[in-house]
Amino acid sequence: MQQPARNWSSPTTHRLKDLKSAFACALHMHQPTVPAGPDGALISHLQYMLEHPNEGDNHNAEPFAHCYRRMAELIPELIREGCSPRIMLDYSGNLLWGVVQMGREDITGALHHLACD
């Protein structure tokens, strides 16, 4: 079976002893599951936020959704600019379940691109 071409950079050639500076970042992305759907069905809190924009800070639902897919824009951009970004991304199962349930292919597609291409 032929292996697909990779779009990402190869493993780093940087040697730890030669680095003068570095930056570490880890992002934890999460949205809880809440019993707020029809008849108390479980839904993503992000979905609840989108459906109730006038409660609390729920008006921020779409910016949150943008953050969940943003890494798939930033990382390829940094690679194109000649950088070798390294980042740990931690997306909770609840968040992934919720965005799939909501049909947010903009998010799942971006994450699939980031993880698999």
Task: Locate the predicted segments by residue.
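N-terminal regions that are enriched for targeting/export leaders
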Residues: 1-89, 94, 98-117
